[in-house]
Amino acid sequence: MAEDDAEKAFFEAQAMNAGSMGYNGAEDQNANASDSDEYDPSSTLQDQYPAPSENLQLQETDTPTSVSQPQPSFREDADPAGNAHPSQPPSRPESQASTSVPATGVSVQPKTRTIGGFVVEDEDEDDAGDADYEPPAVLGVEDMNIIPSQPIPGNANEATSTPDVSLDEAAQESASAKNVPNSSLSSVSLAFKNDGSMDLGQNLYNSRTSLQPEIARESATATPAPDSPSTAKGRLPHDRVGILEDRIREDPRGDIPAWLELINEHRSRNRIDSARDVYERFLKVFPLSAEMWVAYATMESELNELFRLEQIFNRTLLTIPAVQLWTVYLDYVRRRNPLSTDTTGQARKVISSAYELALQHIGMDKESGSIWADYIQFIRSGPGNVGGSGWQDQQKMDLLRKAYQRAICVPMQAVNTLWKEYDQFEMGLNKLTGRKFLQEQSPSYMTARSSYTELQNFTRDLNRTTLPRLPPVPGSEGDFEYLQQIEIWKRWINWEKGDPLVLKEDDLTAYKGRVVYVYKQALMALRFLPEIWFEAADFCFLNDMETEGNEFLKNGIDANPESCLLAFKRADRLEITSESEQDPIKRGAKVREPYDRLLDALYDLIAKARTREAQDVARLEETFKLRPDTQPAANDDDDDDQSETKAKESVKNAQIEAVRHAHSIQIGILSKTVSFAWIALMRAMRRIQGKGKPGEVPGSRQVFADARKRGRITSDVYIASALIEYHCYKDPAATKIFERGAKLFPEDENFALEYLKHLIDINDIINARAVFEMTVRKLAANPENVHKTKPIFAFLHEYESRYGDLVQVINLETRMRELFPDDPTLEQFAHRFSAPNFDPTTFRPIISPSQTRPKTVYPGGQVPSRHGTPSSRFPEASVTNSPKRPLEDFDDDMSRPRKFVRGESPLRTTTQRRQLDQQKRTQTALQVPSSGSQYRSQGSPAPLPRDIVYLLSVIPPASTYTAGRFSAEKMIDLVRRLDLPASISQIPLPQSARGLGTGQTTIGGQQFSDDGGYYYKGGVVDMCALHFMDDGVFRLYVAGLAGNILARILFFGSGGLLAYLLRTVQIWDPEIPRR
């Protein structure tokens, strides 16, 4: 039947990944024939609705060479146990569509020519990008006259050079020394004689087309791994360009140094067109790399290629908010519009509009201070005089004031300098109006200054690079530094969201613009981190910025096509915004587009992983072949030689197996991801199109059929499809899907568990027990799979303990004890009666109040132990009572009120101290055997150390202190009787100290200028003075050490106390050296 073909393809795909998937397909193929008449919902749709894929169209546009290319095939008697080589190619044509087309692919085969016995491709001299040139809006119109109407030839500025080429090993000995230039559009490895070139649309698993018939026949039956840079042969040591091209082809997103070295290599050889080509290829992979755009623009500017330079500006300025890029643009505009010859004012107008455009896009950056300063200086250089009365003067004044007021509100490095310039500008025009403007702008300036300080503190270690790197795997090199950069960027984003500039209420648009700007800056460095793209899009959607949010998602998917997070978010947005679409087929096609792109990227990763596995295995085998074999001695036996050979072979096999196991883990994770992508698509199509109708609407069943055709899926897809059929439609097809999945995944414990749950949900207990016995028996037969049976046993044990027979429960527990002897029996028994949130077998009721008696609090955190401990060096003082009045002990009677411990009186005589020492020794001897179990009453105070007790016994009593004592009552009364003046003018001063403050005052031999007010000189030494200022502030002048001492005396005197109470004291210390 039709379903057999699909299942057969699935079996063959699963057999190639048996190591990572963990199932056996031997008896599944036989079961397929016996159950061919069973119903499967996907079998009714697979013929009418083939799996959609963009790459399927490539087979229609292949050249005759690729069409006639022999395809590798599998024999029908493949290993049924799943022991096939992990790197075998898929045997179905559907899997070929999963490989994405390289970015440099073209639809027309290039023309070839033969040079020196080598087949090479002609270079493409066309430059299609120049024809669509549009000048920037702010550039002068007069510049259009010098732009050529025809595209500039690709090699116009390229000097003749002799680049290196790539050769095979056979060609290294026989080929001529003549080199041929590489293509300027794509790096093509030259093939020698019987080596065919791989078609750009060809699947990665297809073998290369050969020119010799016998080699073509061999490639039809063998499964060679495709050539790769790591294993490609024939690169000459001095072929620097070819080696770098190989590195880029192998890892275009991860090997950034190879890109940079290749650009430098071309530029050092004066191959400008080749350098341009590498720049273009690099910027397709990293389109937000402002550093490389700046380098590209700088190269064109140095070559005086102004037309190409303007093209770069048109492509980047409005999409890449980078201060460096806008600086290059402003330099170009000022270069093209000289002010020295500007008689009409048109050049100044163009430059001014360019500055306005730049500040509109990057003026909020904390590194934009130089552009603000240049803009202000540009305005100052304009016609008119600041402070003049003409219309040009007034216009210039208004422009400067507006520019300053905009600049001082931005938290940037130059904000302090610009504020000082603005202060001088306003005060130089009119002090009265200047104070008014400064007072109005001061809050904004203070907020910007404090915000910049705070921002600079936590971004000090931030690396604002625009050359993104792939996230290192945890535990790999650079993972800590990468996580640190992510944390700093997130702190900056959250800081902007917190609205430190208080813009949300006054200017909501500016607040949103600042947050989006920081997101764009972060994404330049964290381009390959999907979480940041998701957060940026989500912020835009929550703030009514639908266009910006969709743009973030689109660019994020371009950067991370294998990200499930971004693809799912994009699909959700399309599903929500397309609710008005009445045609479910059109709506489903629109929603399915992100899923298809994600699946293509994931299948491509699986293909690359398998290719990498084959390369690693081939490299290991080549390494063992190149090892020199030790020559056995003449008296060695053949048995020793054979044992040594076997040992080497076992070592090689062990290393190869380790490599394959490592790759199988990665492929298994990728297969899991592919499966959940199919599940998400299946659920989305169910919401939009339902389960589908044959010949009308595909629905979720068609997605299930597509997933089975493309392969590389786990049991999760079968589980999800079956549960959708059951929960949404109550369709009997759910049981059929579970039955088919049980044959495909006989050792998958998760699938068996879900199958059991489904059978119990439909009340098919007999089949549930049968499935349980079959699964457990099969898993327990292999000791390595015994642990997989534990969740299955636990589930059925829980069901039987609630709804089954006690004999069944006991039998299950007996089998569980045999399989898991380390598990405690108590837990198995308690599992019968417990729930996830309560276990009655562990409940201990409170029977007596003594069970709830509070714990005894011991001083110092010491808790008495059950076993005796060595006695401390000093006995506890709580049992050391004064011989004068013994301390009463009511510990035995808990009902009587507790008394506070009375402080011990000092022991005056020597006899009393002797009695105390004898009492301590007696108590110490009695406490030794029972010191650990001694009971102390609750809440007793901590004992005093022996040294403190001794000190209290030797100090004199309080009656012997005859000196003067401080009286707090008299001090408070003195403060109450103070006559505080209402103002400064009411302070009585000596007539001799009054003056007009017009001269100088000598204090301690030093001269102080009189700036208004009165002086009061204190002390005979004349070393300090209290200056009463006209503005109501006390200023205390001091001179030298004596002046400082006298200032403190005066400060706490009557006048100083008055100044302290008024809180208006200023201490003025001119730091005059002491005389």
From Swiss-Prot:
Q: Per the record, which residues fall in region Disordered?
A: 20-185, 215-237, 621-653, 840-941
The record's keywords, sorted A to Z, are: Cytoplasm, mRNA processing, Nucleus, Repeat
A single GO BP term for this record reads: RNA 3'-end processing
Predominant cellular place of this UniProt entry's protein: nucleus
Any Pfam family hit = Suf
User: Which function does this protein serve?
Assistant: Component of the cleavage factor IA (CFIA) complex, which is involved in the endonucleolytic cleavage during polyadenylation-dependent pre-mRNA 3'-end formation.
The encoding gene: rna14
Enumerate the InterPro entries for this protein. Answer: HAT (IPR003107), Rna14-like (IPR045243), Suf (IPR008847), TPR-like_helical_dom_sf (IPR011990)
- A single GO molecular function, which one? mRNA binding
Source organism, top-level taxon: Eukaryota
Q: What is this protein called?
A: mRNA 3'-end-processing protein rna14
Chain intervals with Basic and acidic residues compositional bias: 885-896
Bias type Polar residues, positions: 54-72, 93-112, 868-883, 925-940
Give start and end residues of every HAT repeat. 270-302, 304-335, 346-381, 395-428, 465-498, 510-542
Q: Name the PANTHER family on file.
A: CLEAVAGE STIMULATION FACTOR SUBUNIT 3 (PTHR19980:SF0), RNA CLEAVAGE STIMULATION FACTOR (PTHR19980)
Q: Where is the composition biased (Acidic residues)?
A: 120-133
Location comes to: Nucleus; Cytoplasm
Cellular component per GO, a single term:
cytoplasm
